[in-house]
A protein has these predicted regions:
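N-terminal Sec/ER secretory leader and immediately downstream segment
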Residues: 33-111
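Long, acidic/polar, low-complexity amphipathic helices and coiled-coil-like
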Residues: 63-65, 80, 90-181
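C-terminal motif of bacterial Sec signal peptides marking the signal peptidase cleavage site
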Residues: 19-23
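Bacterial signal peptide processing site
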Residues: 25-28
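Extracytoplasmic/luminal low-complexity segments enriched in Pro/Gly and acidic/polar residues
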Residues: 191-277
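Short amphipathic alpha-helices in soluble, non-transmembrane regions
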Residues: 40, 78-90, 160-171, 218-226, ...
């Protein structure tokens, strides 16, 4: 049996441990780290805005993310300064109780992901500079696992197809080699090209996951569907076809048309809905 003094000592030890832990950092670690990110980045050169967000997964543990905004016409050298600083911040602050999900630089209509290693960031910046100097593209997201590129003009399947093929011609020499989360060699050759609806969200998208995986059958099906019924949304990749008709009444015929052209695709690989679904 514990003595009174033993119980008091145990309570004191617990209280001391709690005080010690609370002194180690913010109990709301994720949102706290996001606030710290915003404060620090807003004072740095070339940065005109900073936004952080975070989830507080457990007491003193969290998952923050952060984005800084720079001028759309920032020079390559100035962008290098910002990316290097972000990369160092990423390394210094991604530790035991904090699991940073991502950091990005917003440059006009583009989002450029930042990684922990300078060599990878240098390669991603070179890829980005190649993209933003090309009049084919008007915005997008550049990161290791996928390059998403917005194109301008009147939406059509032909325009999407030309942009997809052109993007591989434009960027093949600049794809970034890296090691994925499972330790396998990988390449930034997954590309999406898209037309955006007013307001900025993607409306019609072609995706290709590597130079050898062109979705020819799916493009043909999209072309036939486009000519058959009005569409409000479409996203097409190899073995994946999703579209929304503007009229719910067109769904059965649209579904039959696509399934008739993509025989052999799994049931869930083809999804046709009405825009109000």
């Amino acid at each position: 049996m514990k003595t009174r003094s033993g119980v008091v000592a145990a309570i004191a030890a617990i209280a001391l441990a709690a005080v010690t832990l609370s002194g180690c950092g913010n109990i709301d670690a994720g949102s706290g780290a996001a606030d710290d990110f915003e404060r620090f980045m807003s004072e740095q050169k070339h940065i005109i805005g900073a936004t952080g967000s975070g989830t507080n997964d457990l007491p003193w543990q969290g998952s923050p993310s952060g984005t800084v905004t720079v001028s759309a016409d920032i020079s390559a050298d100035e962008l290098e300064t910002v990316v290097d600083m972000l990369g160092e911040y990423y390394v210094d602050h991604d530790r035991g109780n904090l699991d940073w999900k991502r950091m990005d630089v917003s440059v006009g209509a583009y989002e450029l992901a930042v990684e922990k290693t300078k060599s990878t960031n240098d390669d991603l910046r070179a890829l980005f500079e190649e993209i933003r100097e090309n009049p084919r593209y008007t915005g997008g997201d550049i990161e290791l696992r996928e390059i998403r590129l917005e194109i301008d003009g009147e939406p059509s399947v032909d325009a999407l197809e030309r942009a997809l093929d052109g993007s591989y011609d434009d960027l093949a020499a600049h794809f970034v080699e890296y090691v994925d989360i499972e330790g396998r060699p990988a390449l930034t050759d997954a590309i999406s090209v898209y037309f955006a609806e007013p307001g900025g969200s993607d409306q019609f998208t072609l995706q290709q996951f590597g130079e050898e995986n062109r979705p020819d059958a799916e493009i043909a099906a999209l072309r036939a569907l486009w000519a058959s019924v009005p569409l409000g949304f479409a996203r097409v990749a190899e073995n994946d076809f999703y579209a929304q008709t503007t009229d719910e009444a067109d769904v059965p015929a649209a579904d039959a048309l696509v399934r008739g052209m993509l025989v052999g695709h799994e049931e869930g690989a083809i999804r046709i809905h009405g825009s109000d679904d």
